[in-house]
Amino acid sequence: MKIKKRIIPNLKVIDDVVYTTKQFMPHRVTGETYSVFDYFYHTQADEVVICDISEKKNFSKFLSKVKRITKKYSFPLSIGCSIDTLDKAKQIMNAGSDKIILSSGIFKKNYKLISKISKIFGSQSIQVSIDYKRLNGCEYISCSNNNFIQKNITEHMKFCIENGAGEIILNSVN
């Protein structure tokens, strides 16, 4: 069986700068947001993921950036930006995003949010991002920035899917 290759860059953004990251710490500037988008647009990326990793989130500023990006570029877009309310999810989707990314840490605060969003936009529009690490034979998932709790990753993925996630993004931080 031949599997179709897809190019899906995952861009970590703070303001108008794209970074590569390692273990939650920005460590290398990749470039200015729009020049990086131009590059992936011309190299025919199949989809682009944008995650706002700034510590002080400015949702309205980020939302404006998403609107500019969706007007200029025509590839599918997944957006992650600390979406913690139904209203924020609606705004991101109405700005032109094809999918939204929810951090699995959101379940600690409001585990019903994913099912509410899924009922409106469909599970195909919901990605849940799980940051995890393995230490001494145990599995841990992130519940916020650098705070991890011990939890079985497979069970957590099942929980996310049962509550409306259409896709799971696993990020190893080991």
Residue ranges and their predicted role:
Residues 2-3, 13-26, 93-174:
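Conserved anion-binding
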Residues 18-60:
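N-terminal beta-alpha supersecondary unit
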Residues 28-41, 85-91, 148-159:
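Short, acidic/polar
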Residues 45-46, 74, 97, 165:
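A structural motif
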Residues 64, 72-100:
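Catalytic cores of alpha/beta
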